[in-house]
């Protein structure tokens, strides 16, 4: 009973962090439309400064995040100018150093999650034993929030570290968990077309997420595609999917 409650609580925290991430992404998309008329370099600078404002308001105690985005902003501006080959090499080297620092800082900020990450990495390599969520120390929302923000800053390194191309069997195990959870949508209420396309027998939507085109899919289905595929098309309307948010009406 206790382990079940811990697992449910952990998934809730992860979904809360995901909501914050997706909301930020949708706001960024809206801002992109607003500044669409600007030159590419100017538009990128504006978005970087908006990022700085967001981090300053939400993560005032995380000074390293603030510093990282400032450095990335400067490097992005330098990268737009005509620089000599040697200077460009230095800029690229500094960019790598910044991402490595961000990676280390992000990992150290995730208190209580290291043991679970080690178990998950072991599973991704051997696929022998998926770690039990409820058997590890509970996370705080601030730790998850810090990690999500860090993931946006050093996404390339995070993808490599956590093996973004998660085996299909991991998603199956996730689906097995969510199918028995309260977020499961009954078969007659909604079907996940991504599950149908994949030939999955579990076509009832679990943990529903609605895309910007208005169609709803399973959290695991839509988020895995958004992370792995550059241009994700909606199976129903064929429009490009830019982001997805939790569907409160179906949950």
Swiss-Prot record:
Q: Which residues form a coiled coil?
A: none
Give TM segment ranges. none
Task: Give an example GO biological process.
Answer: ERAD pathway
Organism, by scientific name, is Schizosaccharomyces pombe (strain 972 / ATCC 24843)
Q: Name a GO CC annotation attached to this entry.
A: cytoplasm
Annotated compartments: Cytoplasm
Identify one Pfam family in the record: zf-RING_UBOX
* Chain ranges of zinc fingers (RING-type): 192-238
Keywords carried by this UniProt record: Cytoplasm, Metal-binding, Zinc, Zinc-finger
Give the primary localization class. Answer: cytoplasm
- What is the protein's given name? Uncharacterized RING finger protein C23A1.07
MF terms (GO), sorted A to Z = ubiquitin protein ligase activity; zinc ion binding
């Amino acid at each position: 009973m206790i382990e079940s409650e811990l697992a449910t609580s952990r998934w809730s925290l992860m979904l809360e962090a995901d909501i914050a991430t997706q909301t930020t992404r949708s706001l960024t998309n809206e801002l992109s439309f607003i500044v669409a008329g600007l030159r590419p370099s100017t538009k990128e600078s504006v978005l970087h400064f908006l990022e700085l404002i967001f981090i300053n308001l939400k993560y005032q105690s995380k000074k390293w995040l603030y510093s990282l985005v400032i450095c990335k902003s400067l490097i992005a501006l330098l990268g737009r100018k005509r620089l000599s080959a040697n200077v460009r090499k230095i800029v690229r080297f500094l960019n790598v150093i910044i991402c490595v620092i961000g990676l280390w800082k992000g990992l150290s900020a995730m208190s209580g999650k290291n043991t679970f990450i080690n178990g998950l990495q072991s599973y991704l390599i051997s696929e022998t034993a998926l770690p039990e969520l409820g058997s590890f120390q509970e996370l705080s929302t601030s730790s998850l929030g810090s990690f999500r923000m860090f993931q946006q800053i050093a996404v390339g390194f995070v993808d490599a570290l956590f093996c973004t191309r998660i085996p299909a069997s991991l998603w199956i195990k996730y689906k097995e968990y969510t199918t028995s959870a309260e977020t499961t949508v009954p078969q007659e209420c909604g079907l996940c077309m991504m599950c149908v396309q994949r030939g999955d027998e579990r076509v009832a939507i679990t943990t529903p997420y609605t895309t910007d085109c208005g169609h709803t899919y399973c959290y695991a289905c839509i988020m895995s595609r958004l992370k792995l595929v550059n241009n994700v098309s909606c199976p129903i309307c064929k429009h490009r999917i830019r982001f997805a948010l939790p569907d409160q009406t179906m949950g």
